Amino acid sequence: MPYERLKNARRVVVKVGSNVVTAHNSLNTNAIQSITYQICMLIDRGLEVLLVSSGALAAGLRRLGLDRRPDEIPQRQAIAAVGQSGLIKAYEAAFGGWNALLTWKVVPIINENDTVMVEEIKLGDNDNLSAMIALLMDADFLINLTDIDGLYTKDPRRWPDAELIPEVSVFKKEIETFASSIPGALGTGGMLSKIRAAKKVTSAGVPMIIAKGDKPDILIRLMDGEKHGTYFVPKSERMASRKCWIAYTLKPKGRLILDDGAVQALIHHGKSLLPIGIVDVEGEFDVGAAVEFADTAQEKLGIGLVNYTASDIRAIKGLKTLQIKERLGFKPYDEVIHRDNLVVTPP
């Protein structure tokens, strides 16, 4: 049974949404106390817990008397700065009450709403961040706590006939359609960003659960194997940390368009990418850059680290490996992307 796997977990990432830790124009200290208590109970069992907490931006908005998140980056930075200190202080105070259980233990508290790193706020959200942390830290599970019970067929806050989807094993288009109908409130995510996070971790072999954060002892009950929320089934094979890093943390600097033969070789046979299978090169990049590859219909298939510059790949595209030195005057590698540096990602 899927939930039984939680009993054997040794390291979990817990992501807590804005609507779980904020209420009535301020931080919800009762919710934070409950979450920290549960984390302490899990640590006392021998688990390692990494906490990704939203709430800084929402806490700042409410503290300043604002009811919507502005689009302008400087304003979002200022609001996050106002809320971040209060959020961390609240967690510090809550964890301080459980020192007997946390003797010399550390719970990393991670938040994407940084006041300095513009790109972090501009492009990221804590759902995506929690997925990256789960992959890079070799977590056994990602638990995403929000203000509804899981993924529904439509927004249950508006539609009484909405049905909970207890398990997702295949990401059909209708899954994103369901998620798109369930927006977030003050947070940056909403259900769609959670589904995208689930795609990432499950494709790398890590299961994820979306559950209601204010259910009594929800973390403890999940770790005891109880069924709650929506369970996202992982692929059976675990992706290596290095490939997770390539697939989900590096920004692509360009794109390679591949013919059908190369697509089949990479996706179905786990081969390296050779120049003969490349039909076009987009962008400018150097050796070692992360570059996407796609089919002739421009559908992204994956990402990898290139052994040649963009200009060199343009010169050798469509050629056999034996012709590389003849065209360039040198041949450090047979492959444009070696299979060890290549990751096929889900659509």
PLM ranges: what are they?
Residues 1-69, 73-347:
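C-terminal catalytic "cap/lid" subdomain
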